[in-house]
Amino acid sequence: LHSKVGSVGFPIRGVTVSVFDSVTNKEMKYGERGEIRVDSPARMKEYYKNLQATKDFFYTDENGVMWGRTGDIGYVDEDGFLFVLGRASDTFTSKSGEKIYCFDIEAAIWENENIADCEVVGISANGYEIPVAHIIVKEGCESYEDKVIETIHMYCQQKLTEDAVPCGYKICKSFPVKDSGKRDIELIKQDRTNFVVPIGNGILKEISF
């Protein structure tokens, strides 16, 4: 077996990849999610004139192995294939203590055929983190955006845990980007008004956070 759908493959010779709990530094079992870390002779030595960033990047385990933190969330299956799911920064802890992965919510939203793009972020509300979804619908779907949101919300309720169901949805024309061309997630998180949430019978309630 040389490949699997969704996997980035095997580490190359001389490179060791493993998955750890980012809080406890416990090495995860096959199939368990965690932060992907790498040990390689080609790994960088340090951040230039930035001791704190260097300390934050490296983790040395009880065997003296120095792992580099990739900042990516993923898992290794029993056949040794590595799967990268998303960024660790796309994760937050809900009111009940559940670890919520924004990319899981996005995957559920993407299953709707009317979606052109989406971005799910965790925002602070009433002292804890909640997920909200920013959505761009495909051209031609503008006349029934409310129905699209209602359908997505119902699907998320069926597929996701209660804490992972978006608390609000916002239809967008585009997403803000940085000068680098990357999506400006922090700016998206600052957008806290004019969301809607389905409350039944085809009714959408306007909500702000």
In which residue ranges do the predicted regions lie?
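Conserved C-terminal "lid"/linker of ANL adenylate-forming enzymes
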Residues: 119-124, 132-134, 153-209
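AMP-binding/adenylate-forming catalytic core of the ANL superfamily
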Residues: 40, 45-46, 56, 65, ...
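Glycine-centered tight turns that cap/initiate beta-strands
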Residues: 14, 53, 114-117, 174
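Conserved beta-loop-beta connector loops within the AMP-binding
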Residues: 18-37, 75-79, 142-149, 180, ...
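Acidic/polar helix N-cap motif
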Residues: 21-23, 50, 54
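Hydrophobic beta-strand positions
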Residues: 19-20, 59, 75, 110, ...
